[in-house]
A protein has these predicted regions:
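Cytosolic, long alpha-helical scaffolding segments
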Residues: 1-179
Length: 179
């Protein structure tokens, strides 16, 4: 009974991760401001998942590989792939609509952001695979290398990943390219 309760709770948790994709209803395409806002909310959830995934992957690398930890990174990467597919399709449908310039800019930014978040999650899976290989080969890190990882994780933790932070990064890159 305890196992079935655990499995049921885990399934509910996984379904909840996809809740923000359900916001992307076809009927909202006729109302671009609402559709873009729902896409933004879903993309921010995707960013939270990407951040969790990269931190979990670094944790496997830093604190020791586990099959369960690897499975979780791999599972979240699959969830993020679903987000990318659903949001990308939704935003592409919006691009055919008449919209104000600011909404068009948001849609363009969000399409770039999708790629960034998906890439972050791909890197998380690569890091988790490296952690597995390190364990299989019996490789250990020097104290200096462990310290460097701690510095990276401390620097990264708490900053959050969202459309807003990615958007600033894209604007900064575009300004630098213009110079």
């Amino acid at each position: 009974k305890l196992v079935s309760t655990f499995i049921k709770d885990k399934k509910q948790e996984q379904d909840k991760e996809l809740d923000d994709i359900k916001r992307l209803e076809e009927r909202f395409i006729s109302y671009p401001p609402l559709a873009v806002e729902n896409a933004r909310i879903a993309i921010n959830k995707m960013g939270e998942l990407a951040e969790k995934n990269i931190l979990d992957a670094f944790n496997l690398l830093r604190n020791g590989y586990t099959d369960g930890g690897f499975d979780e990174v791999e599972r979240i990467e699959g969830v993020i792939d679903k987000y990318e597919d659903s949001i990308g399709t939704y935003l592409t449908k919006l691009t055919g609509r008449e919209m104000p310039k600011d909404l068009n800019r948001s849609v363009a930014k969000y399409l770039h952001t999708l790629t960034d978040f998906e890439r972050i999650s791909d890197h998380a899976l690569n890091i988790a695979e490296s952690a597995r290989e390190i364990k299989e080969k019996g490789i250990t890190f020097t104290p200096n290398a462990l310290h460097e990882m701690d510095v990276m994780m401390k620097e990264r933790s708490g900053q959050g990943i969202s459309c807003r932070t990615i958007g600033r990064s894209h604007r900064r890159t575009m300004r630098e390219d213009a110079l």
